[in-house]
Amino acid sequence: MSTWSSMLADLRKQAEIAKQQAKKGIDVTKNGLQYGVSQVKLQALAAGKSIQKYGNKLVLVIPKDYDVNTGNGFFDLAKAAEELGIQVKYIDRNDLEIAHKSLGVTDQFLGLTERGLTLFAPQLDKFLQQHSKISNVVGSSTGDTVNKLAKSQAIISGVQSVLGSVLAGINLNEAIISGGSELELAKAGVDLASELVGNIAKGTATIEAFSEQIQNFGKLVQNAKGLGGVGQQLQHISGSALSKTGLGLDIISSLLSGVTASFTLADKNASTSTKVAAGFELSNQVIGGITKAVSSYILAQRLAAGLSTTGPAAALIASSISLAISPLSFLRVADNFNRSKDIREFAERFKKLGYEGDKLLSDFYHEAGTIDASITTISTALSAIAAGTAAASAGALVGAPITLLVTGITGLISGILEFSKQPMLEHVASKLGTKIEEWERKYGKNYFENGYDARHKAFLEDSLSLLSSFNKQYETERAVLITQQRWDEYIGELAGVTGKGDKISSGKAYVDYFEEGKLLAKKPDDFNRVILDPKKGKIDISNSQTSTLLKFVTPLLTPGTESRKRTQTGKYEYVTKLDVNGINQWEVNGVKEKGAVYDFTNLIQHVHISSSVARGEEYREVRLVSRLGKGNDKVFLASGSAEIHAGDGHDVVYYDKTDTGLLMVDGTQATKQGDYTVTRELSGATQILREVVKNQKSSVGSRQETVEYRDNELAQSGNSNLKAKDNLYSVEEIIGSNHRDEFKGSKFRDIFHGADGDDLLNGNDGDDILYGDKGNDELRGDNGNDQLYGGEGNDKLFGGNGNNYLSGGDGDDELQVLGNGFNVLRGGKGNDKLYGGAGSDFLDGGEGDDYLAGGEGNDFYVYRSTSGNHTIYDQGKSSDSDTLYLSDLTFDRLLVEKVDNNLVFKPSDHNSNRGSLTIKDWFKTGHGYNHKLEQIVDKNGRKLTSDNLETHFNGTPKTNLLGYTAENQNESNLSSLKTELGKIISSAGNFGLAKQGNNNHSAALNNDVDKLISSASSFATAQMGGSGIGLLPSNNANSTILSGLARTA
């Protein structure tokens, strides 16, 4: 290993030792400074013992002819010295002058004489006059003597503490007697102590210089290897950001007048000569007079140890200093200023909206950044000095005491600065608090509430397009929109920084009116209280005279009042606890005369209380009680329990707009139509909107503030037993959730929608209307004339007794009716199975390969060219008269075949993609059943009877084209068909169709029949006023007519 490498390794080791010793010095200093004035005497005595161990006590020297009652309060200083056990010596001025000359003591208040360490009263008086801030602390010789005495003791004991660190390891008695290098070393230490005290008093004189220096840092380190990123960040700091005075930096000294040189040392690519030059510059400029004193002290130490003081030694010191400088500490400084800049840009908008709190927060980070930058940079420079001292003392027998000496000094300064930092930051925070209080006195309003007001104004500006669309979306003339301005990070942080967490609320609710998509002008403050009272939990829109939407645009916190208490939980820790006096009910009075829409989906009804492994998440529930008016209302419920008094009109309750849990709707105990009990399971993965207590943390230096607030979150309930229970009164229609719901109807008419999920709907008695919607649903009409709509999915529909209408919709459905009523069964898309009852049924398989069984009674089947491969199995009585209607086909284009016992119809065009129609067991006899269809009618009114087909197959037909076998076109066939079909449809659904007049044109009669068929598909819309689910229309106009030959019967 080269000599230079070995030297660097040794330097790194020495630097690390110096850092550890510096840390110890800081810790010792912190422990000493935290006691306050009451411990001043103990500190002074301890420091005196440290000095006395190696030399005489500290002596306050006062000329005999010096008037202690003049000047800046030396009467108090003399008394303080006596109280602290410091000797006060009055000597002739001539003796004092001789002592100065013989010992080379300059015109400073600290010195070395034959008596030992000496405080020179005149020089100290002059010093205090020059530094008014220190002088003001001491005060005059009149006034509060006890208080001034304590302050005087603080000054003197502080000087003793400094001297105790500086002179540790030096025997002053021997140094004074022997003179020489030891005496020079001691004098250098005293000089250093004087500079330390002096610099602390210099105030803000060089803050602007510091502003320029930190800019130079960025320029220098931007090009230094390994420090480019730091340099770029520092360049973002505005030069003017650090140039302001009056920021609470009164005790920051001018330690940084030449700190630029330290970054030159950090450039590992710089030449040795450059580092040497930078090292000398650092020695003379980095921290002003202190660095010069440290340099003198290092040189004196090296002379005392017989070590070299040449250029290479200086380079060695400079190299060690470079290792001690950590630019990473400046990243936090840059982050503070960048955060201030970001907040300031954000604040500009809200300042225009009447709130300046964001600017105040930006000011805090700006000023805190200045303080932090100053102290960080000073500490970095002091670390470099400690490392340089360690390098200078390397190899010396007195190295360890000397290193301890300097690290003690730097530790002392760092401790003073660190303990000064907190009061400075608190001073800045206090100024912000004062501004807030002044604003509140002027405007008579809570400052943070004003911040929420500004946030809401911005929300309206940003969301106007969305808010304006609600009138049209919900089809109402007026929209009453309630918006919760939730907890705001910046507003909360300002409350924490200023210690006013007990003055802030978790947010604020607002009410806005929109008509015809336009925002109405704001009314006075009492407007909100009329519509919404969040403290009492009351909402009232009963005065609205038009159709109205009540919508909670954002989640609304539960009703009640908040209170907060700020408590100190540690030396620098404060917690502002939140207490909520909650109301367990929302009460809503709706529009009296007009229809309205009530969207409660963003109403928070669950307050999170606690969590445990055994019981899961626990909640307090807030129940919704709503009293509506006479109009047709729509109510969208949230996840909590509700009591809905719907009033007159056709009212609908929706559970599908948010996750309301699995439903069990029960109307079996109802004594009035529209009364239901709804039980909801909110366990497992059910997502509920819940209110939780969160906390925001902010810091002011060492002070940590935690403020609790209410917020909302959408989360799994986490409670396997959590339920909600609704009581619905006078509700005509219920829309289910997106879970597997169960509906049990009443003895009255029920209208249920399963919505998403595999639902079970049972209408029980009454003329019910059931919709499965999406999912594989099961619908049971039971007794009564029911309408069942499967919707999407593979559904099962059971009509029960009565005249029923069943529509499978999409999917592979199964439809079945009982009894001898008139029933309509429509399969829709998919491969369906349709089973009629003992009465007259209409069976339309729709698209797909369907199976149709009419059962007993006079049944009516429909087949189209788009129907796929259908199978009809009619197991009726011999007296039955069943009909097959070929909606868009003619006999001329069909072939008929006997396949086993089945009658099969196929397109005459063998290449056609159309399906076939099989009438199962047509030719089967016995068992007492009739499997034939008595008549088959095509789109033009031509008819085939079962006898015609019997004759056809018993003879020797020239062709299987049915056109040769069917009767001639006859309009009376279509007229009769229309009558039969109309009877079934009108009985099953009571469609209220107008009677069709006679029409001699067969095409018109065909259209009338198709109108009867297609009218079924529009029944839901006609009956439900648009709220139902329509049927698939009949497809009767798009088939391709196949050519064929027709034979006259």
Swiss-Prot record:
The chain crosses the membrane at residues 246-266, 311-331, 375-395, 397-417. Hemolysin-type calcium-binding repeats lie at residues 744-761, 762-779, 780-797, 798-815, 826-843, 844-861. It comes from the Bacteria. Keywords: Calcium, Cytolysis, Host cell membrane, Host membrane, Lipoprotein, Membrane, Repeat, Secreted, Toxin, Transmembrane, Transmembrane helix, Virulence. The lineage of its organism: Bacteria, Pseudomonadati, Pseudomonadota, Gammaproteobacteria, Pasteurellales. This is Exotoxin PaxA. Its main location: secreted. The transmembrane domains are believed to be involved in pore formation in target cells. One of its GO terms (molecular function) is channel activity. The keyword Transferase does not apply. InterPro entries: Hemolysin-typ_Ca-bd_CS, Hemolysn_Ca-bd, RTX_C, RTX_pore_form, RTX_toxin/Mannuronan_C5-epim, RTX_toxin_determinant-A, Serralysin-like_metalloprot_C. It is a multi-pass membrane protein. One of its GO terms (biological process) is killing of cells of another organism. The keyword tRNA processing does not apply. PaxA is associated with abortion cases in swine and septicemia in young piglets. Shows cohemolytic activity with the sphingomyelinase of S.aureus but is devoid of direct hemolytic activity. PANTHER family: S-LAYER PROTEIN (PTHR38340:SF1). GO terms for cellular component: extracellular region; host cell plasma membrane; membrane. It is found in: Secreted; Host cell membrane. It comes from Pasteurella aerogenes. Belongs to the RTX prokaryotic toxin (TC 1.C.11) family.
